[in-house]
């Protein structure tokens, strides 16, 4: 799993400037895409992070360490510099 977490952290690119906000939950998510065509959504409740990924036709969930999750959110905030929107789903 460590290789998957490293790939998410190093190779993931933000698909757009939208923060996903599901109805009636306290979760927020970011869409990530990868060069080989895989996709993930990085979810957080403010304390814990996990990624729900689709790769090679399979869906799987990966727990993300807080330090890496915080770093990905910080990169998102720096990239879009407050120019992001919420997507209610």
Residues covered by each model-derived region:
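Function-determining sites in protein domains
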Residues: 1-89
């Amino acid at each position: 799993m460590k290789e998957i977490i490293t790939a998410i952290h190093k190779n993931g690119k933000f698909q757009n400037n939208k923060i996903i906000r599901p109805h009636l939950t306290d979760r927020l998510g970011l869409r990530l895409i990868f060069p080989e065509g895989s996709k993930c959504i990085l979810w957080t409740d403010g304390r814990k992070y996990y990624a729900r990924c689709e790769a090679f036709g399979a869906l799987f969930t990966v727990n993300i360490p807080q330090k890496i999750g915080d770093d990905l959110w910080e990169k998102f905030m720096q990239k879009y510099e407050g120019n992001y929107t919420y997507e209610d789903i």
